[in-house]
Structures are given as C-alpha cells and as structure tokens.
C-alpha cells in the first residue's frame, strides 16, 4: 500500500470518525526457509555461540556509540533499531564497556507494549532489549551528552553511567544514529536538536585529538544526507553512510497494515528501512569477509525498495572513501556463528513502507482503533489525532505565509523550498539558522518532529540575508492570532535550537 494512499485513506477515515463523534488481517507472505538470527525458537537459542574475543585479529579496541534520538511509543522503531544494533555488536564480541547506548527507555515497559519488558525489531524476531546497557536514558539523552561521550570528556557528561569513548590512536569507532531528522538537523528527545554544523566541529575535534584510527558512521533519518553534504571533510579518517540524500525522507518498515506486518497486537512500526537493511545484512554475513563497501551496496539496493523511491530512499556516502575495502568486523565485530555463512543476503522484501513523518499518525490511528466502544480514552485519542493534524496544517500555512511576506507572494514558496546544488552545505551561517528557528517558535509554536522538514526554509531565509527583525515581523503577522499554548516550546520541552 503506497504511503500516499494510506495518508488519504487515513484522512477520510478521520473525517468519518469525527463526524460520528459529533452526532481476517492478511497474513504476511514469508519464504519458509528464511529465519532471522533473532527469531524466536529454542533451537536458535540453543545454537547461540559464545561471543568472539573483542580484539581478535587486529591491534586496537572497537568502540561504539548507539543513539535512539526519540521518545514515545509511536517511535518504537528507533529504540528497537538501537537495541538490535547493540545485540549484533555484543554477539560480535564488542565488550559492553566499549558500547555507549543512548535511549530514552520508555518503550519496553510502556503500558502499550503487548510484550512487557521486551522489544522486537522484526515481525518474527525475538527480544532485542535484554542485556542492552542503559548508559544514558530519559533526560540524559541530549546532544551535549552525545558530543561529550564522543570526545571522551567525562567531566562534561551529565548523569548516566559516565561511560565515554576513551579511545586510543589505534582504535576503531562505530557510530549509529536512528530517529527523525530534517535538513541540517537530527532529532533528540530532549531539546535542542543536533545541528550539522556543530556535529562536524565535534568530529574535527575528535580527529585533532589523535584518538582513533578509523571511524564509521551510519545515520537513519529524513534528509540525513544534509548533515554531511558540503560539510564532511575527506581527511578525518571517517566514512559515513546515510539513509537518504539531503532532500528526501527515510522510511519506517514492518508497520501495521503493511507487508510484512508486525504481529497483530503491535500498533506501531517495528523498524526503519535503512536500519533493518544493514542489521539483517550483518546478521547473515561473515563480517570477516564482507567489506564496508559490500554492505553499502547491498543496503543501498534494499533501501531503494526495488527503485520505488516514492517508498524508499537513496542511501548516500560521505567523508573518506579510501578504506571502504576494510572488513566490517573491524567495527561491528565477528559472530562465530556466521563463520561458515556464504555471502548471500537473504531477506523478506517489504512490499511497502511508511514515511517517517507519517508513522506517528499511523500509530495514533491504530491506537484509536484498538480502543473499544465510546470511552473517555477513545475520545482523548481522537482529540490527539485532531490536534496533531491541526498543528501540522498550522505549520504548513505559517511557513508558506512567512515565505510570501519575506520573498513576495509570487516567489515566496519557491524561495523557501529551493535546494542548493550538490556539494554545498544547507546554510552558510548555522547561528543564523538557530536564531530564525527560535524566532519562529516564539510566535508560532514548536516545530515538532514533523516541522523539522522546514529547516531548509529557515536556511534559505538566512542565505538570502533576511534580518532577524524582518523574520520576527513576518512570524508575528503569520501567527499572531494562533493560540500556541498546547504547542508552546515551553510545553514541548524547550526550543528546537
């Protein structure tokens, strides 16, 4: 089912339900021979081997930072992704003391979780939550803590385990991030967001400290290519792949109503397309034979969703591409159970996906459907859907009107949406971008994870030399009559910048 068809059907259904308030699932078709390594079953558990040595076959230590940048049960998939990644690294022999995990940790024991205390990342998968270290959880999952951990700065971290990447010149570092994003930004459950300009500076500082040999970064988020496009140097010994290019969405997968679908008791997406692609690849390959480039090409092919890029995305690569021939075990470890696996990737191909920015609406709608009869909980769920859609429409119309006020009624929308040519960064002045975001939110309410997509509009306002005073005037005119109490930055945990 195409995402646009789902969205239209959702809106029609919502209108019908709202009007009423005022006055056998298709089984997923699975190849019977396919069994994922995390699939439930006593035989698979009994065959699980002992972990491999952490530093086998090379001098140095493997380090990893895993970040789930969201919170809330509707964003189940991001923490599922990160927990799954942690399981892969642990089975590969990467020591827990060398893995730093950022996750809000509000999913496994959530009242909506049909299997309390567990998290799954695959429709037929087993628990990926058990044994995952909770280094930074809840309010400790911040951009500042992430940067401090990466830099190995123990005095700069706030709360948590205090664990940091205390790496040495011969060590290898793997960073994996999964969440919502927008042009030039990555989400965090505690504001402000992570901005590309700041992230690149931190990577440069890490390189200047001579505290690693090579680093590999995987990023799952909408417009994730914009974090590195025109910004990522090629001389830092850092290789990056992203789920999407600088101008497109990434996609959730294993979602309710899609094929393959999660177990019927789940009302939210279990994973993200790029993320499950690389993890299911790593689980079914000998990582002492598979190279970084091998995985990039396989993940690129799968994430394009058979070239249906209206339901898939372009996986991109940035930074230093000279060491793509290195074997993946240097970063993800080696699971002895995969020692005799031939490099033939086997996966169930999703028939459809859900736009990252629509996945929360899908969850809310499934939650509404799940509630029986006419109850206060069901009416509350309906109001939440209506409020969320109304705020989205408000953001859409406000940004559009600000563009017309700033650039003229004829050219405004095009000026806001214009993407720079390949190789150029999103914005010339990152401080200006942050200021424009704060001005907008002060008058128009929080951007939310949906509104992150408008970061390019704010960047273009900066790139065209619009003053703060003019932006404030336009924001007041666009939003002066909007009651933003429900969506105030103070209510939503602060400003996005």
Swiss-Prot record:
Entry protein name: Vacuolar-processing enzyme beta-isozyme 1
Highest rank taxon of the organism: Eukaryota
InterPro entries: AE, Legum_prodom, Legumain_prodom_sf, Peptidase_C13
Active-site residues (renumbered): 180, 222
GO biological process terms on file: protein storage vacuole organization; proteolysis involved in protein catabolic process; vacuolar protein processing
GO-annotated molecular function: cysteine-type endopeptidase activity
GO cellular component: protein storage vacuole
Record flagged with keyword Hydrolase: yes
Function per UniProt: Asparagine-specific endopeptidase that may be involved in processing of proteins targeted to vacuoles. Cysteine protease required for post-translational proteolysis of seed storage proteins in the protein storage vacuole (PSV) of developing seeds, by processing of proglutelin precursor to mature glutelin subunits, thus contributing to the formation of protein crystalline structures in PSV.
